[in-house]
């Protein structure tokens, strides 16, 4: 018998948000439940709010933080391995996703231990989604080419040191060709499914975050509270001018 996805209730100073955590992302599910039971989230703030994008919380230094304090760096000293269940789970409006540090220091896209965001996003047109697919395909091709360069680094360096420019050009063209062929084979990875397209066109979300951050739950009640938080006034650092507090997180 299939075990039901666990439900948590996030009590905030603006109202309650009911969230389903996915059993398909057990590392994130268990980590969130553990922190909730320990009271880690009690008193923390939604410290970063961007209209038509998301609301973010979980900075462990945000509790009772002065209104002028810069927030966003507070965490628990460990990360949670990425759990991409794509395209089943994506950044539709109401998705619960894990914050993380950037690719340059975190190429594995591991998640923050405590920081999360809830997607608000916006509605997209077919033309905009088509353009995003092209951009995703270009990024995939570049990623593949970079990997091939790394795999052939010693040969490239030898040709470069020996001044063999023609051979270097031939090798580069060969790697570009291989990258294009692999991209063509993996084209489906950058295509939106019919379900994604329909939701992004009707309810909205943030499609360019897909396969970049781990989605591990979704709001099932209280989306109006999420929207209320999304629309508060913020300062130049996207911090609300009046503190929005997570008073507690209840399991079930």
Where are these regions (language model features)?
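Cyclophilin-like peptidyl-prolyl cis-trans isomerases
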Residues: 1-252
